[in-house]
Amino acid sequence: MGIMIKKRNGRKEVLDITKIQKMTIESTLGLDGVSQSELELDAQIKFIDGMSSSDIQDALIKTAVEKIDIDVPNWTFVAARLFVFDLYHRVGKATHGIKGEPYCHLKDYLKYGKDAGRLIPNLGEGYDLDDLNSYIDPSRDFLFNYLGIKTLYDRYLIKNNKAEPIELPQHMFMAIAMFLAQDEK
């Protein structure tokens, strides 16, 4: 029997290494000087029986961060991708109930943010939200390095009253643009 983990929903199950492999493959894809197997093996040293799936994600991120070096700078993008995957999971679960789904429609984001009291009530009025939503491209989130996405998360992304993130980078940038241009004719 393998390592038992506690899922985010409280359920316990045996650690499925194929899920970790999928995550590590996606996080290293197309980046020079980084190794999926190295990330996976080094992170597994930190896995202990009873840890949560959230702790496993944190271990993967920390392992990638520890590997950032002037000689292998792409580890910062691995750490950033892992962080973004976790952010997608957390925001999706909190806002539209679909864990891991990158972005809900802009209308849904605005409604949730307003209902949570985190966005101004008239934000989005007078805009073609379907058109603006078509400009959201989740692949842009992977242009951040780790320090960039971590700073954005810590300082700027909106969180609910439980301190859970409810906003993703492109929704934030779109909301800022809509707010700044709202009085333009």
What positions do the PLM features span?
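Extended catalytic cores of very large enzyme megasubunits
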Residues: M1-K185
